[in-house]
């Protein structure tokens, strides 16, 4: 199957891919994957919540929203030294990228210097850096870029026409605007969504269509399977057919051939066999470690054992060529900002 990079995918084309027999879809996705990546290599990231709970948003899936009774206690922003210690542990465990997440609607300018210090110190360990802090303006994005940040994560979560069923405190366009600010300053983007929230296949097509028709495909595409947390509105939602999740991975791989497709939240509930199908469908990145923000993740030892059983190995740092360097028309903006770092 052709792996030409396209930005003009249509909903009809994506529906046709989803409708293929699963063996045929896996074959096509694997063919595209092998044109750009070594199928035996998996990029390994670790995610740390550097500021937990107390978020003012109402995302129906999120245990960190302060309006839901989920048992998550709001905590202050971690000290830089504590974050660096966690990053050292992640590197020793085999991670090549360290992601720092904060439960904010958007960071305040006064928070940026401390986040920037975290980025600089983690970067000095030889790790790639990623942050997910909520909505950013262009000046904040530039400050993070100047500190050495490699990736910024900001998910669109779902399709535009299902979004209002899940979130009311932030508009879909707000998410697209943050992605534009991140691209404008030259940061690599990490952007995906969540499935299993009660959406239909049409909505899953809409999510991938949004990502695959952005001005530049995200460098990383995290595909999250809803982790149902008691106290959140989506607790009790009917679980997604595992084969539908595999189809989601495969269509993401076909439509965004050079992106890292990441198994993210929900992997704790996946069998080894399901994870193998996802790797065969083109997933080539995982979050590694015992916890993703506030929800469980497979233990490091389990992942290491699975890699050994499947003959997989961690991808070395910087083996993935940045999509930002490959995409046409990605012009970095000239920005005049007050000095916040």
From Swiss-Prot:
Q: What are the Radical SAM core domain coordinates in residue numbering? A: 40-267
Name of the protein: Biotin synthase
Q: HAMAP family recorded for this chain? A: BioB
Q: Does the keyword Transmembrane helix apply?
A: no
EC numbers listed for it are: 2.8.1.6
Which positions are annotated as binding [4Fe-4S] cluster? 55, 59, 62
By its UniProt entry, which PROSITE patterns does this protein fall under?
A: RADICAL_SAM
Chain residues that bind [2Fe-2S] cluster: 99, 130, 190, 262
Q: Which SUPFAM superfamilies match?
A: Radical SAM enzymes
Lineage runs: Bacteria, Pseudomonadati, Pseudomonadota, Gammaproteobacteria, Lysobacterales
Natural source organism: Xylella fastidiosa (strain 9a5c)
């Amino acid at each position: 199957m052709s792996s030409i990079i396209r930005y003009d995918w249509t909903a009809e084309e994506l529906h046709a891919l989803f409708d293929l027999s699963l063996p045929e879809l896996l074959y096509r996705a694997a063919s595209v994957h092998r044109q750009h990546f070594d199928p035996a290599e998996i990029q390994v990231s670790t995610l740390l919540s550097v500021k937990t709970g107390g978020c003012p948003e109402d995302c129906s899936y999120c245990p960190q929203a302060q309006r839901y009774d989920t048992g998550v206690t709001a905590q202050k922003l971690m000290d830089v030294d504590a974050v660096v210690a966690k990053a050292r542990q992640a590197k020793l465990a085999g991670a090549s990228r360290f992601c720092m997440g904060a439960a904010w609607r958007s960071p305040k300018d006064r928070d940026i210097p401390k986040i920037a210090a975290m980025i600089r110190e983690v970067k000095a360990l030889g790790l790639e850096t990623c942050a997910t802090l909520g909505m950013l303006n262009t000046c904040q994005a530039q400050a993070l870029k100047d500190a050495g940040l490699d990736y910024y994560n900001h998910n669109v979560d779902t399709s535009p026409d299902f979004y209002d069923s899940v979130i009311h405190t932030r508009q879909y366009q707000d998410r697209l605007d943050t992605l534009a600010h991140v691209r404008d300053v030259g940061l690599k983007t990490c952007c995906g969504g969540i499935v299993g929230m009660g959406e239909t296949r049409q909505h899953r097509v809409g999510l991938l269509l949004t990502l695959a028709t952005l001005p530049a495909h995200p460098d990383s595409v995290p595909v999250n399977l809803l982790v149902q947390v008691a106290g959140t509105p989506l607790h009790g939602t009917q679980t997604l057919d595992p084969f539908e999740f595999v189809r989601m991975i495969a269509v993401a791989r076909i439509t965004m051939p050079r992106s890292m497709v990441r198994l993210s939240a929900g992997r704790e509930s996946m069998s080894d066999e399901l994870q193998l199908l996802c790797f065969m469908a083109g997933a080539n990145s995982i979050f590694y470690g015992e916890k993703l923000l506030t929800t469980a993740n497979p233990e490091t030892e389990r992942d290491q054992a699975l890699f050994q059983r499947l003959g997989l190995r961690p991808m070395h740092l910087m083996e993935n060529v940045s999509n930002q360097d490959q995409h046409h028309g990605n012009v970095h903006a000239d920005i005049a900002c007050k000095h916040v770092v």
